[in-house]
């Protein structure tokens, strides 16, 4: 068995663009023969997949699964809406979801490692980068999920509530994007940041600091209500807040998770005209 040195792995990475573990594995299988390793990687699609890895995967699907008191929510990304609807891509996402659920896996890196070979093969087949982006779980007395076109997914956990009510709350979370369950849950750093923004706005209007501070106190109460689930008007009946709805049912929401495909991912927009102009200048 030939020794697989760090310099050999480095050379293969530079020549193929594949990941370190992928290169090391290929070299082990080729008994240290770098040319054979490259040939094998070409056959398996690993090199093609590595070239796709730099492409921004900002489309994709959200998947959820609930059984009893345990639920998981998963985001798997691809590059286009067309591939997001592809049967092979959907099957891959379902398989990842089932494995995460069965093993109660919430470490996305562990999940990525488990499915790396299948991901690479799928990238080579469909020609787009694919990324298992995030996974989260939720436990509670009553759980419900809601998917909006597979692009927005929500899990809600509640106590003393029937499943239909919790389902409606999941739909509310999908539509209204709360960040916290209750106003008192809004973190101190978020409150402080918003307070300073509102104080600056009030001071710019020429108000004395004492009056500006009193104005901001009222605005902060409104702000914490707007970003919390229980403080928001219920989307199906805006005449009452979610807190009032829960009180009517003697119910309580303990937690929720909301995923939206691609949120926070910077998608590169190509200016075709500028690209053509740049190419013409180079010619």
Curated annotation (Swiss-Prot):
Gene3D superfamilies: 1.10.286.20, DNA helicase RuvA subunit, C-terminal domain (1.10.8.10), Elongation factor Ts, dimerisation domain (3.30.479.20)
Single annotated GO MF: translation elongation factor activity
CDD domains, sorted: UBA_EF-Ts
Repressor keyword on record: no
Keywords recorded for this protein, A-Z: Cytoplasm, Elongation factor, Protein biosynthesis
InterPro entries: EF-Ts_dimer_sf (IPR036402), Transl_elong_EFTs/EF1B (IPR001816), Transl_elong_EFTs/EF1B_dimer (IPR014039), Transl_elong_Ts_CS (IPR018101), UBA-like_sf (IPR009060)
GO cellular component, one term: cytoplasm
SUPFAM superfamilies: Elongation factor Ts (EF-Ts), dimerisation domain, UBA-like
Region (Involved in Mg(2+) ion dislocation from EF-Tu): 80-83
Compartments where located: Cytoplasm
Family note: Belongs to the EF-Ts family.
Described purpose of this protein according to its UniProt entry: Associates with the EF-Tu.GDP complex and induces the exchange of GDP to GTP. It remains bound to the aminoacyl-tRNA.EF-Tu.GTP complex up to the GTP hydrolysis stage on the ribosome.
HAMAP family the record matches: EF_Ts
Entry protein name: Elongation factor Ts
Species classification: Bacteria, Pseudomonadati, Pseudomonadota, Gammaproteobacteria, Enterobacterales
